[in-house]
Structures are given as C-alpha cells and as structure tokens.
Swiss-Prot record:
Gene Ontology molecular function, alphabetical: GTP binding; GTPase activity; ribosome binding; translation elongation factor activity
Any Gene Ontology CC annotation: plasma membrane
Protein known as: Elongation factor 4
Record's function text: Required for accurate and efficient protein synthesis under certain stress conditions. May act as a fidelity factor of the translation reaction, by catalyzing a one-codon backward translocation of tRNAs on improperly translocated ribosomes. Back-translocation proceeds from a post-translocation (POST) complex to a pre-translocation (PRE) complex, thus giving elongation factor G a second chance to translocate the tRNAs correctly. Binds to ribosomes in a GTP-dependent manner.
Reactions performed catalytically: GTP + H2O = GDP + phosphate + H(+)
Subcellular location per the Swiss-Prot or TrEMBL entry: Cell inner membrane
Length: 602
C-alpha cells in the first residue's frame, strides 16, 4: 500500500485539467501513442465540445520515480461544475491528494475555490500547480498570491507547467509521489469500498467505479450494498489504465471497477459502501458500519419536457429512461398539461445539468422538445397543517387553502474583479439577495449572499455574466427553506387558464412580471379572427391585461355609396359571426410562448 497514490485534479472550466490528465497518462505509458487523443478521460461528445467533465473517470498509472521505485498512481478525474458538487465530493473523498490546477494567465475562479474548500474539509492534501506557463500573458507571481490569499494554502513551491508543451510534467509526478500520503486503510479488516461513480454499459450492465478502503474483494465473491442491502456476484474486477485491464482481486487502497450484472443504475448509488454479503471460512464477513458521507441526491430545479408531436411521447420516455441509466440524478415522472398534452416533469441538479440533459436528448435521441420555464421546489403548509412539496406551479393549491409557502434559500459565493462589485451587488439586491460577507483578495472580491433559488434559476447566471463582462463566477449551495410571500401568477387566454404558463413569483414583483408576460404573449401569439384577451391573475384578481385585436375582413368593400342601413346590416352580421366564433374558437399557443417566460426581463 505504501506505493499507491490516489489523487485528483481540481480546476475551473478551461484551465487545462483534461489536457494535463492526458499528459500524465502519456508520460506513464497508460495508452499507446495511437490511442492518445485529446481529452482521453472525457468520453461523451458533449463533454469534449463544452470542454467540461461531467462524470468521473479514472486512470491507474505506473510511474517509475527518481528513487528507482515503481509507484501506482490512481488519477480520479472530477467534474468541475458546481451542479455536480456531490459527485465532486465523492471523487475527492476517494483521494488523499489533489492537484489544484490554476491557469497562470487568469488566476483563481469561484468554482475552483468551492471544490478546493470541499477537498480541504475532507482532509485532502492540496498541491498547487500553475498551468499554461507557455502563454505570453502568464503571470505566475500574481496567480501564487491569489492562491494564498483566496484559498489560504502555501503556494511558494507551486509547480509551473504547461500541459500543452509538456513542461513540468515530471516535476508534478515527483511531487505527487513525495507529498501525497499513501492510502489510509486496513488490508486485514473486513471489506469496505466506496462507489465513486457508476455508469451503464450496454454489454455488461452497470459498471461501478470503487475505491477499496479496507480489506480486499476477490473475483466471484458475493458482496452487498450497505444502503439498500441488495447483494450481487463480483463477476469481473479490474482497473482502468484508461483502457480497462482485468484483475483477480482489488486490494485496500486501490481504485478499480466492479461488474456484477446489475441492471439498474439506481441500485449502485454514488457514495454507497460495498461490503461482503456474509461470513465464509475464507473471508472476514461484512463490515459493521458504512463509510461516512453518503446522501441521496435531491433534484433542485424542475421543468416540464414535452414532445412537439404527441405521437413521440413513447420515444421521449425511452430516451429519458436511457439517459437515466447513465445519470442517476435525473428524475422524471409523466405529466399532463392541457396546453401541451402528454409529457414529463423532470428534476435536475441545477441549470447546467438541465441544459446538458436537453442537449443530449436532442442530439443523441433526435427529440424535438418543448421545455417549460424551470421552477424550484416549494414547501407549502396547508390550512390543516399538512406540509406538501410543490415542484410544479400548476399543482400549487388555491391561495385560500395555504397557511404559508416556504422557498429554498441558497448561499451564493460571487467572485469578481473589484471594478464590477457595484453592478453585481445591484443585481443581487434586485434578486432579493441578503449580503452576508465581502472580502478583498488583492484585486479580486468575494461576495457572499443569501438568495432565493427561484430567483437564480431563471436568468441570474446570464445576467451576472453580462453585468461583469464575463469576469464574475459563482457557485451556490442549498441552505434551508424559509417562509416567504410568494404567489402563483396564472396566465389566461380568453378566460381559460394555460397551465404550462403559470409562474411562482414574489408578491412584490407579481404585478411587474404579470404585465411583462402578458405583453410578451401579445407579441408572440398571432392575430385571430376574433379578439383574444390575455390576462395575468393571482387567484381571482386580474393584475394585467393585453388584447390582441381581431383581424377584420372589409365587408363594406362592395357597397358603393348606398344607404347607411345596408352597411349597418352587413357590419352587424359580421359582428354576430365574430361573437359565435369567439365562443367556439380556440387560440393556438406557439412554442416560443413557453420560452418567452424565460426572456421576460429583456
């Protein structure tokens, strides 16, 4: 075990994490030259395109150090985005060390800070590395100062490197061998292994990536999950060098995969502990207690997904089920809307997660989707004291039956150059933010706010980028549910509620939002042969109204001169026809209308 080193790489998007991983793999001969491609560890197309890492991947590397010993280095790739923070914490808890990769030309960013704090909380040794030193605008001294200021770890011997040219790679490997502690764990205790990640493979079923903490697992042994108690046979074991390499046993301190013919990803939850099923003469039996830190992931943001053609409902369901095989944090359930027909209510970890799921549905499964405005989960206390969770605005009970509504509050860390503090604070205050803290680190400022999650999901991130010219970065974590004066605004077309257009907003903004949505609808819905009234209402109170005037045929065109009574007769006839039409006519709501809710602000 003394020759094993488990480490991961923490970096902000675009700071060169995947490229650095490629270099380390290449240096240790993990893949032959012909198998090397850019971003070896990012296996999904969308990961390579957006340059982000979503699922954890690993590589077991063999490195012959300068002291002549051969070390087994396990690189565990972590997702860098805040939506996937639970996956990050699981990846990090499987490591003893982490390389903090900072772009020497840009300095530290908010998400790096968030992941770095997670690592320090878990007791992981953090080693700073300055990447992109080949760029002419690299400023290593400033980057070091920022690391010390913001994160508070000593950066005097941070290693300068360039993943692109390969400079400094050997120094990084030596640093890992010297500074990262060997795995703590007891090879002679009962088996305990933590699931870092799991994904679905069409040939063998679920593949689990595990870090063995205590004991060992042999091929063919029966093991069980401690959270669910389900037991399976360890059919195949092995390690990734990124290509997979079968083994007969996984020992304490190692990171490897287990294939056990599991059909559903839900059975292999990330963060769960694996132990042996029962005591046999040749083993030590099951462990007493599970490894700490496991929690069920709760979706934070909900949206409705509907197929554009009603006949494609089944394909959409199949597509979602297939996605769920590889993404256990995606929740969905069938939902019916009067306006959009049959579809699904889906739960996501955050906005990036939602975008990625939508994009994968459209790209990998050829789905045409209508998406409703994202909403968050509210805790509603009804008149009789019963507490229900409402994640869909159209399911909100009537005002009269509600005692109070509690909305989710998150703690947000905003990180930006000091000249943008003013606009960012104005934005946070508009969104009902409460400032908790403000700290200067050199030229950078870190603001801490409490904000309602409902205000963030619509457009906060885009606005933040625009008021700070793209320099501000943010991350958020859930804090609590808090009572708040929020109301449901319904949109009515000719007196009929359109359920998919309902929104939940704070009372202080309800009139403004109602007017804005009504005005937007007026632009989008095409003119009919009769008047269309668009109204925004809270309960029975109408708070805004717009009217789309009817198109009129000129029925008087063929009367040249003539008596006024003749003209009046034709006009009355037209009026009667319009009135009848209005009673039976229905208004088509185009797809853009559902997206318009998101862009009301502009």
């Amino acid at each position: 075990m003394n020759h094993i080193r488990n480490f991961s790489i923490i970096a902000h998007i675009d700071h060169g994490k995947s490229t650095l991983a490629d270099r380390l793999i290449q240096r240790c001969g993990g893949l032959e030259e012909r198998q090397m491609e850019a971003q070896v560890l990012d296996s999904m197309d969308i990961e390579k395109e957006r340059g982000i890492t979503i699922k954890a991947q690993t590589a077991a590397l063999q490195y012959k150090a300068r002291d002549g010993q051969v070390y087994n280095l396990n690189l565990i790739d972590t997702p860098g985005h805040v939506d996937f923070s639970y996956e990050v914490s699981r990846s990090l808890s499987a490591c003893e060390g982490a390389l903090l990769v900072v772009d020497a030309s840009q300095g530290v960013e908010a998400q790096t800070v968030a992941n770095c704090y997670t690592a320090l909380d878990l007791g992981v040794e953090v080693l700073p590395v300055l990447n992109k030193m080949d760029l002419p605008q690299a400023d290593p001294d400033n980057a070091k100062a920022e690391i010390e200021d913001v994160i508070g770890i000593d950066a005097t011997d941070a290693i300068p490197c360039s993943a692109k040219t390969g400079m400094g790679i050997d120094e990084i490997l030596e640093l890992i061998v010297a500074k990262v502690p060997a795995p703590r764990g007891n090879p002679d205790a009962p088996l305990r292994a933590m699931i870092i990640d799991s994904w679905f493979d069409p040939y063998v079923g679920v593949v689990m990536l595990v870090r063995v903490v205590d004991g060992r697992l042999l091929k063919g042994e029966r093991f069980k999950m401690m959270a669910s108690g389900a037991a399976y046979n360890a059919d195949n074991l092995g390690v990734f060098t990124p290509a997979n390499e079968p083994r007969n046993a996984l020992n304490a301190g190692e990171v490897g995969y287990i294939i056990a013919g599991i059909k559903e990803l839900k059975a292999a939850k990330v963060g769960d502990t694996i132990t042996l099923e029962k005591k046999l003469p040749n083993n030590l039996g099951p462990a007493e207690q599970a490894l700490p830190g496991f929690k069920e992931i709760q979706p934070q943001v909900f949206a409705g997904l509907y197929p554009t053609e009603a006949s494609e409902y089944d394909q959409l369901r199949d597509a979602l089920e297939k996605l769920q095989l590889n993404d256990a944090s995606l929740h969905f359930e069938p939902e019916v809307s009067q306006a959009l027909g049959f579809g699904f209510r889906c739960g996501f970890l955050g906005l990036l997660h939602m975008e990625i799921v939508q994009e994968r549905l459209e790209r990998e499964f050829d789905q045409d989707l209508i998406t409703t405005a994202p909403s968050v989960v509210y805790e509603v206390v009804k008149g009789d004291g019963e507490v229900i969770m409402v994640e869909n605005p159209s399911k909100m009970p009537d005002q009269g039956r509600i005692q109070e509504i509690r909305e989710p509050i998150v703690t947000v860390h905003l990180y930006m150059p000091q000249e943008y503090v003013g606009p960012v604070m104005t934005l946070a205050n508009q969104k009902r933010g409460v400032q908790l803290n403000m700290a200067y680190h050199g030229r950078q400022v870190m603001l801490t706010y409490e904000l309602p999650l409902g205000e963030i999901v619509l457009d906060f991130f885009d606005k933040l980028k625009s008021v700070s010219r793209g320099y501000a970065s943010m991350d958020y974590e859930f804090k609590e549910y808090r009572a708040s004066d929020v109301v449901k605004v319904d949109i009515l077309l000719n007196g009929e509620k359109v359920d998919a257009l309902s929104i939940i907003v704070h009372r202080s903004q309800s009139a403004y939002r109602g007017r804005a949505v009504a005005a937007k609808m007026r632009e989008i819905i095409s003119r009919q042969m009769f008047d269309v009234a668009i109204q925004a209402a809270i309960g029975a109170n109408i708070i805004a109204r717009e009217t789309i005037k009817a198109l009129r045929k000129n029925v008087l065109a063929k009367c040249y001169g003539g008596d006024i009574t003749r003209k009046r007769k034709l006009l009355e006839k037209q009026k009667a026809g319009k009135k009848r039409m209005k009673q039976i006519g229905s208004v088509e709501v185009p797809q853009e209308a559902f997206l318009a809710i998101l862009q009301v602000e502009e």
